[in-house]
């Protein structure tokens, strides 16, 4: 629905939304005239608020109360009146630089830390999806003997996730082999796997047919069959990946969750609703890629869904601000903030934007 507002109407709408975000209380014309430099009388403000209510941007929760924004009012506010400043973006970037350790090669640790920081700074729930194991590519493979007849495959993906698979050595093939020789053989096999599968997906490795190996590696056929069987089971157990959640305690302090039922609904969704949230983030990622491909600069690709705009019924009382972090041009996962529709959109949009860009930079720099 296209809507053209006058400058005065936009000023009153912005003041109303800003007041409600800050106080969680309906506001009347006298309060707006007193607290905001609108340069118009309370009577004029009251008339403008009445017009905004007719357009569906504001409503009165009670007949004797002031007005609050509707979902449509928030939508116009976000689309037309919110633009995070470069100063705010720089402050958030500086905060992430100070608080996050990017020297850790375990990317999941970085994501967990980012979720907690995002939740603390936003006062809402932070949601960050881990990269899908099935679409990750292999960065490094290493076979190491951990005890007699037991070998561990250590696998690092391009997202710096680490997986390990423990397996038993085939006794018939290795019983009489010197331990030093076993170590040499494992190194040879590690080199072979790295040469053929670095840059490939886990599925490519799982699909390897040991019977098609070069003659010099035929003696490893039984060993590789066992290894690939165990790795296949490991991959199945990893899909789908979890969603990291931070800040439940933060958002429950908001007045919207003073009622027990509201709080319980949100807690249940975040603790037990992973199967609902993952498809939602996949949908949001697809929308962002479709809308932003080759047109919008990377840092502006933020998806804001407000209240009833959310396809998932259980979050239609909330707003979700999300963006995609990626490695180069390849989307890897999503960063989101979930909170009341009365959230500080300007700050949250800046937080999500900077965090997604930050994670993308970290992934790209370690490529």
Curated annotation (Swiss-Prot):
Transmembrane segments: none annotated. GO terms for biological process: negative regulation of DNA-templated transcription. Keywords: Repressor, Stress response, Transcription, Transcription regulation. InterPro entries: GAF-like_dom_sf (IPR029016), HrcA (IPR002571), HrcA_C (IPR021153), WH-like_DNA-bd_sf (IPR036388), WH_DNA-bd_sf (IPR036390). The keyword Repressor applies. Pfam families: HrcA. One of its GO terms (molecular function) is DNA binding. SUPFAM superfamilies: GAF domain-like (SSF55781), Winged helix' DNA-binding domain (SSF46785). Belongs to the HrcA family. Negative regulator of class I heat shock genes (grpE-dnaK-dnaJ and groELS operons). Prevents heat-shock induction of these operons. This is Heat-inducible transcription repressor HrcA. The gene is hrcA.
């Amino acid at each position: 629905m296209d809507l053209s507002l006058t400058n005065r109407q936009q000023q009153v709408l912005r003041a109303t939304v800003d007041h409600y975000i800050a106080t969680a209380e309906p506001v009347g014309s006298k309060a707006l005239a007193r607290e905001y430099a609108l340069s118009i009388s309370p009577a004029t403000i009251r008339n403008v608020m009445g017009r905004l209510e007719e357009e569906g941007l504001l409503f009165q929760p009670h007949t004797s109360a002031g007005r609050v924004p509707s979902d449509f009012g928030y939508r116009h506010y976000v689309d037309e009146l919110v633009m995070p400043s470069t100063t705010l973006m720089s402050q958030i970037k500086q905060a992430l630089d100070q608080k996050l350790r990017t020297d850790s090669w375990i990317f999941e640790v970085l994501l967990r830390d980012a979720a907690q920081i995002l939740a603390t700074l936003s006062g809402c729930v932070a949601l960050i999806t881990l990269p899908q194991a099935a679409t990750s590519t292999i960065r490094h493979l290493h076979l190491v003997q951990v005890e007699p007849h037991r070998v561990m495959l250590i696998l690092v993906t391009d997202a710096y996730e680490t997986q390990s698979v423990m397996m038993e050595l085939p006794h018939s093939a290795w019983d009489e082999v010197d331990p030093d020789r076993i170590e040499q053989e494992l190194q040879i096999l590690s080199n072979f796997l790295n040469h053929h599968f670095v840059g490939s997906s886990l599925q490519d490795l799982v699909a390897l047919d040991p019977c098609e190996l070069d003659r010099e590696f035929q003696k490893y056929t039984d060993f590789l069959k066992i290894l690939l069987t165990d790795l296949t089971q490991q991959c199945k157990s990893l899909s789908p990946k979890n969603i990291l959640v931070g800040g439940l305690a933060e958002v429950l302090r908001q007045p919207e969750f003073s009622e027990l039922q509201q709080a319980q609904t949100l807690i249940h969704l975040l603790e037990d609703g992973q199967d609902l949230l993952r498809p939602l983030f996949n949908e949001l990622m697809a929308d962002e890629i479709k809308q932003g491909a080759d047109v919008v600069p990377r840092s502006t690709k933020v998806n804001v869904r407000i209240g009833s705009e959310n396809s998932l019924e259980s979050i239609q009382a909330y707003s979700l601000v999300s963006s995609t972090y990626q490695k180069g041009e390849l989307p890897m996962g999503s960063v989101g903030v979930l909170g009341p529709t009365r959230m500080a959109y300007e700050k949250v949009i800046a937080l999500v934007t900077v965090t997604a860009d930050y994670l993308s930079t970290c992934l790209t720099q370690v490529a």
